[in-house]
Amino acid sequence: MSKYFTVEVKPVMTPVNAGLNAAFADGEVLFDWTSFQVPRGASKLIGVTAEIRPKGDSGSTVNTFPFELLFAKTKDLVAPSTLGALNSAPAALADIEGHVDRYIRHMPIVAGDFGVTDQLAVASADAPEGMVLEGEINSGNNV
C-alpha cells in the first residue's frame, strides 16, 4: 500500500454550457468551491497537476495562463459562501467576510509550471511549503 493518497478533483466549469463564451480575464472566478476528501487528520499537500483544455478556436490553441487555487474547509459542516459568479470578479468582501475562518491557503500555478502538447496544456506545481489540508473531524468518510 502506498504511503500517499491521491485525489482527483474535477471542478465544474460551466461557462459554455451557461452561454458564457467570453474569455476569462485576470482575477476572474474560473469555478466555485469543489469538495473533495482527504484522509482524516492532517494531510500535507505535495503538489497539483492540472490539465487545461485548448481554446475552442480552429487551431486548438493551448491555454497556458497562470491561475490560483484556493483551499478552504467546512465549519460546522457548512461550506464557505460562493466565490462569486463564474467569468466575473470574485464576490465582494462583505459577502465572504464571515467565512474567512474556512480559508486554508492558496496555491499559485505559474506560467513556468506548464508543459504543452499539441492539444493540451498540463501544469504541475509543488505545493507551497507546509501546506496542510485538514477537514473537520466529523466530516467525510475516509479514514
Give the location of each predicted region.
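Surface-exposed, low-hydrophobicity beta-strand/loop segments enriched in small/polar/acidic residues
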Residues: 1-143
